[in-house]
Design a protein with these regions (language model features):
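Positively charged n-region of N-terminal signal peptides that target proteins for export
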Residues: 1-4
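Cleavable N-terminal signal peptides
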Residues: 10-11, 21
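Electrostatic cytochrome c docking/interface patches
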Residues: 22-45
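C-terminal capping alpha-helices of c-type cytochrome domains
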Residues: 24, 95-113
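Gly/Gly-Pro-rich "capping" loops immediately C-terminal to redox-active cysteine motifs
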Residues: 39, 43, 58-85, 91
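The canonical Cys-X-X-Cys-His
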Residues: 42, 47-56, 105, 109
Length: 113
């Protein structure tokens, strides 16, 4: 039993669970990094996001994305779109987004508190 617990702890610490890719392991292409992001366009696109990612954190285990750093949101959305991070719902949502839309959403959500 003790060996089993140690193995589980090791797996958790090393991040081998699906979707546990860290942002520093994702190489964003220059074309997405060079975009500024239109906050107004991001607000227009955000209605689908707000359905699950509620501002008050009441999303039943779904992370609050309001006020997160722009680069973090860009990295996460890019990783879901490219299927680097594993979550079927997020892969489907991000899979429909262009680089411009990803950056616009990130700019919009970064500005919210």
């Amino acid at each position: 039993m003790l060996k089993y617990l140690f193995a589980v702890q090791t797996i958790v610490l090393l991040g081998f669970f699906p979707g546990s890719v860290h942002s520093d392991e994702i190489n964003l292409p220059a074309e997405i990094l060079n975009l500024d992001g239109d906050r107004e366009y991001g607000e227009y696109l955000a209605s689908d996001c707000k359905t699950c990612h509620e501002a008050d954190g009441s999303g039943d285990g779904i992370p609050n994305i309001h006020g997160r750093p722009k680069i973090q949101l860009i990295t996460l959305l890019y990783a879901y779109r490219e299927k680097i991070k594993l979550n079927e719902v997020m892969q489907m949502q991000a899979g429909r987004l262009s680089n411009e839309e990803i950056v616009a959403l990130a700019a919009y959500f970064e500005g919210l508190n």
